[in-house]
C-alpha cells in the first residue's frame, strides 16, 4: 500500500459566488517532487493555500501524511514549509535578525540553524542588510530560508522562480 504525503479529495473553494477551485483530487507519494501547472487564474495558488492550511476548502478533504487538516491543522502545518509567491517579510528587519526570530518561533537554535540556512540559501552577502533593501531574488532566498527553518517534510513553493534573474533560478 503506497503512503501518500498529500491527499486532496474532491476539493473545491468558493469566494462568494466565484468557484476558484472545482472538485480537484490528487495524491502525492512521499518523496515525490511535483508541480502544479496551468494558466493564470486556474486555482494553483488557491490549491496550495488550502494544502498549507491558510485557506479552508469549501468542499472536500485534505490529508497531510494521513492527518485530516481540518481536524488537526497545527500538526499538519508542522510538516509543511511554505514559500508564498509574495512573501510577507518584515522589511524593516535585518535579514539575520529576521531569520533568528523565525528560528526562535519554530523552537530551533538560531545560532546553529541560521548560519546553515544562510549558506544553503546563498544569503551570506545580505545577512546584515534590511529586507526592504534586497532585490526580489534575495527576498525570495530569505523566504526560502524561512520555509526551510523547521526541517519540514513537505516544501511548497509558489512561483519560486518568478521575477528572478536567470542565473538565480538554480
Task: Report residues per predicted region.
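Conserved ABC ATPase signature
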Residues: 130-134
Amino acid at each position: 500500500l503506497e503512503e501518500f504525503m498529500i491527499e486532496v479529495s474532491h476539493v473545491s473553494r468558493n469566494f462568494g459566488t466565484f468557484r476558484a477551485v472545482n472538485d480537484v483530487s490528487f495524491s502525492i507519494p512521499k518523496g515525490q517532487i511535483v508541480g502544479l501547472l496551468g494558466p493564470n487564474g486556474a486555482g494553483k495558488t488557491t490549491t496550495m493555500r488550502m494544502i498549507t492550511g491558510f485557506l479552508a476548502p469549501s468542499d472536500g478533504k485534505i490529508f497531510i501524511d494521513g492527518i485530516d487538516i481540518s481536524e488537526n491543522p497545527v500538526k499538519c502545518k508542522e510538516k509543511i514549509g511554505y514559500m508564498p509567491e509574495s512573501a510577507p517579510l518584515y522589511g524593516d528587519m535585518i535579514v539575520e535578525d529576521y531569520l533568528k526570530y523565525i528560528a526562535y518561533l519554530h523552537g530551533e537554535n538560531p545560532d546553529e540553524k541560521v548560519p546553515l540556512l544562510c549558506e544553503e540559501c546563498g544569503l551570506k552577502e545580505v545577512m546584515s542588510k534590511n529586507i526592504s533593501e534586497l532585490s526580489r531574488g534575495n527576498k525570495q532566498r530569505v523566504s526560502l530560508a524561512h520555509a526551510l527553518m523547521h526541517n519540514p517534510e513537505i516544501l511548497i513553493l509558489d512561483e519560486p522562480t518568478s521575477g528572478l534573474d536567470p542565473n538565480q533560478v538554480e
